[in-house]
Regions:
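Detector for Asparagine
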Residues: 22, 38, 72-73
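N-terminal first-folded block
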Residues: 1-27
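Arg/Lys-rich, often Gly-containing low-complexity segments of ribosomal proteins
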Residues: 10-11, 30-38, 60-64
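Compact, glycine-rich, soluble single-domain proteins
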Residues: 4, 25-49
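C-terminal structural segments of small proteins and small subunits
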Residues: 42-74
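Solvent-exposed residues in well-ordered beta-strands and their adjoining turns
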Residues: 8, 29, 72-74
Length: 74
């Protein structure tokens, strides 16, 4: 399953908001430096979907706020 994520980094409160079936807003405390925010988003998504971090992969948007992830939950 592919999902679109709008990343909000440097937030005081971390969390995930589901806007539609495959569109999410993910807030993380980490800043977008050295991939820390991407790693935090992957961790948040894996916790949300209750799957291993290795099943969440960033397809596009490595340096963008708009990201495309693939979730392998099979």
């Amino acid at each position: 399953m592919k999902i679109f994520v709008k990343a909000k980094t440097g937030q005081k409160q971390a969390g995930i908001e589901k806007l539609s079936e495959n569109i999410f807003v993910v807030r993380v405390k980490e800043l977008p430096e050295k991939g820390l925010a991407n790693a935090a988003i992957i961790a948040a998504l894996s916790k949300y979907f209750r799957i291993a971090k290795s099943r969440v992969s960033l397809i596009s948007g490595h340096a963008s706020r708009q990201k495309l992830f693939e979730i392998n939950n099979t």
